[in-house]
């Protein structure tokens, strides 16, 4: 049976300025039968104003397929190769479901049916909306802030633990030092006691006597090794005042010596006596310096008076002459 469709007449402006219109006729004829091929004919008669009118035709032959047969199109081939997104049709969805089940059979096989939207989401690139992107960014920001807080809390905890450990170690070191000091004191006393027991290690007080600094606070035996600046100045002043009496020198020599007791510790009475003797020697030296200064002044005044008298007497003798 032949199907003939009517022609369509179109009027198009020509490029030439003199010509008004170009008449074009399109005739489409198609025939379909039980045979496997059909042909379509397109004829385009063109009429123009010039006398040399041309008429040309286009012919197109297309192969038709019987209704009972099915052929594979390039889209199907691309779909099988995975290069084409699936259409939302039941057979395609079943194929996608089979492929997914085959791929996930190694890990976990799920037989739930896949909706068209889920299949499209699986095989199509995901398109994020602005709301979804904003939510993801918010989640990422919250996670990052929580991680930062967790790290900072851990660092603070570690820092506090280290500081506590350092403080504890310093305290333990101080305690150990104090214990060692106390043990040393007790060991010294024990050694002194043992020296008393053994006559070979008995120490005579005359040999152990040392020269003591008279300007040290004798009441506190722990500060014996320290010296004061004022003590040095007083020592220099005593060196200058070398014309002190023999009593003050003997007192200073007595005060500069101290002895150990029977138990190895310093005798407080001897220390007090030495401190009193040193104070007396200092006072005696100061008084001696004052006396020497006054005697020098008196000698100077007497010499000045004598010189003035001699000068006056010489002047009187000259006047008499």
UniProtKB/Swiss-Prot annotation:
Keyword Cell membrane recorded: yes
Disulphide-bridged cysteine pairs: none
Keywords: Cell membrane, Membrane
Renumbered residue ranges of the record's region Disordered: 297-321
Molecular function, one GO term: kinase inhibitor activity
Predominant cellular place of this UniProt entry's protein: membrane
Record flagged with keyword Cell membrane: yes
Signal peptide from the UniProt entry: none
Compartments it resides in: Cell membrane
Stretches with biased composition (Polar residues): 297-314
One CC-aspect GO term: plasma membrane
Matches recorded under PANTHER family: MEMBRANE-ASSOCIATED KINASE REGULATOR 3-RELATED, MEMBRANE-ASSOCIATED KINASE REGULATOR 4-RELATED
The protein's name: Probable membrane-associated kinase regulator 3
Species of origin: Arabidopsis thaliana (Mouse-ear cress)
Organism placement in taxonomy: Eukaryota, Viridiplantae, Streptophyta, Embryophyta, Tracheophyta
Gene name per UniProt: MAKR3
